[in-house]
Amino acid sequence: MDPQFLVFGQLTREYLLPAMGSARLDVAGGSLLYVAAGLKVWESNVGLIGRVGSDYPREWLNEYKSRGFDTRGIRILLQNMDVREFFAYNDSFEVNHINPVSHFARREMTFPKSLLGYQPPNEKSADKAGVLSVTDIPNDYLDARAAHLCPMDLVTQTQLIAGLKRGTASTFTLDPAPSTMTMAARRELPALLNGVTAFLPSQDELRNLFWGAKHDLWQMAEAVSLYGCEYVVIKCGARGQLLYDSNTKRKWEIPAYPARVADPTGAGDAFCGGFLSGYCRNYDPLEGVLYGNVSASLKLEGNGAFYPLDVLPGLAAARLNALKDMVRQV
């Protein structure tokens, strides 16, 4: 069966030093994977669109297939690609992406040779070979009903949405890249967000977009809504989420489900996947936030993108029912 839900994003090779437990070195990661897993907590027909180099482990791609994902949209390039990501968490679960040598030394661990020459994403030039284009979308994927775009450059996201509109998809959710959320880039947002169903920035990204101009998150959400998206969902980490409805001007606060935090990597992405599923059930944004909230809570409690898929059956549904009573309309 052709996928009904599409996720566009990046696949990476993670090197992760957690706040507790063993290091996880050279494991499958990337926003594409975390969103897809958060979506698959609730749905089955999920298609992945991304690019990897010829050096990307084939056994990982085989695992994605065995998990039930449609991987026809993952394009394997002829060249190698450096898709390494480094995460080091302190005891407060604050993350650091730079200077991995010092973090390994501090923990008295041998520095892995496979991490030599690593540069954090904000310091290395973007690999143009990894940039997605409309031609990466298999024709069969154009029959999908909904799509989520992970963080990537503004031009690419705009072009992908335009390409998807040639098909049957009517629901588009979008997580912005940090480079999009600057005052300088703000004038480009109307072209990106016009026709987008839900815009899903973090509170830090939104504050950066309105740096010095606005201080209230609700005012920021209202301002962004004027760019053409139907809903603005602000991801606030441990505080949960804020939901703003552009049409009715209604506002909700949804607290984070009280999960036991083991590894926060990808929790925001898992939220986006869950949101897409929940929203498409009845086209209710609040239902979307609740589903996303639960997906994020499952990811927080374990390591790896697929941890939410291996929890006890019925756990997600139980959390969803409990969370409904915690919502507050502002």
Which residues make up each language-model segment?
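Short catalytic helix/loop segments, enriched in acidic residues and glycine
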Residues: 21-37
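Positively charged, low-complexity intrinsically disordered leader regions
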Residues: 1-19
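Short, conserved phosphate/pyrophosphate- and ester-handling motifs at nucleotide-, phospho-/glycolipid
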Residues: 39, 202, 268
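Conserved phosphate-binding/catalytic region of the ribokinase-like
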Residues: 1-3, 146, 185, 214-330
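Alpha-helix C-terminal capping segments
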Residues: 36-45, 278-281
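Short beta-strand scaffold segments in enzyme catalytic cores
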Residues: 37, 85-87, 240-244
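Conserved beta-alpha-beta core of the PfkB/ribokinase-like small-molecule kinase fold
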Residues: 144-222, 240, 246
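Conserved N-terminal subdomain of the carbohydrate kinase-like
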Residues: 13-21, 45-146, 317-330
